[in-house]
Amino acid sequence: GRPFSWGARPAAGSRGAAWGVHGGGAAGGGGAPGPAALGPVELHAADIDPAAVRCARRNVTGHVHTGDLFAALPDGLRGRVDVLAANVPYVPTGEVALLPAEAREHEPLTALDGGADGLDLLRRVALGAPDWLAPGGCLFVETSERQAPAAVEAFTRAGLTASLAESEELYAHVVIGTKP
C-alpha cells in the first residue's frame, strides 16, 4: 500500500459503524476531516449503540441517527454520498478474549466483535455502499494488516475499485473503495 496521513482518530465513545455526509455525500464519524477542509458539508452520523448516539449528539455538528448501518440513514442520501467512513469492529470472535482488559471491560461486545474472521460488518458495509455512494464517491474502513487482503477482496466483490492505505507510524491500514 501507499503511505498516508491520518489526521484524526475515531472519537471516544464511537461504537459499531459511524457515518457522515460531505458536500452532498457522506463521511464518517470521528475520522472525518474537519468541515473547513471540505467546504460546504452535510454531515450525518449513525450508530446502533444508544450510548454512542448520545455521545455523537453532544459532539457532532450535523444529523445523528440511531440504527443498524445504512438502515439508519435517510433514503434521500442514496446515490449522493461522496465520502463514507465506517468504524466497524474487526476483531475476530475467537480473539476478543485476548484484548486488553480495558477494552473488554469498558466497550460493548458489538464494538469489538467483528465475527468469525473479523470482517462480517466490513463485508456488510462494502455490499451496501454502492447504493449510497455517488459516482466517484469513496468508502473508507480501517482493518488490520492481517485482514487487509480479504478486506480489499470484499470491496472488489462489492463492485468498488479497492486500494489500501497504510501508516507505519500509526500501525493503521485503511481500505478505500471508490464507486466507478
Regions found by a protein language model. Give the residues of each.
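Conserved SAM/SAH cofactor-binding pocket of Class I
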Residues: 1-98
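Short, solvent-exposed coil/turn segments
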Residues: 41, 74, 105, 136, ...
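Alpha-helix initiation/capping motif
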Residues: 45, 74, 111-118, 144
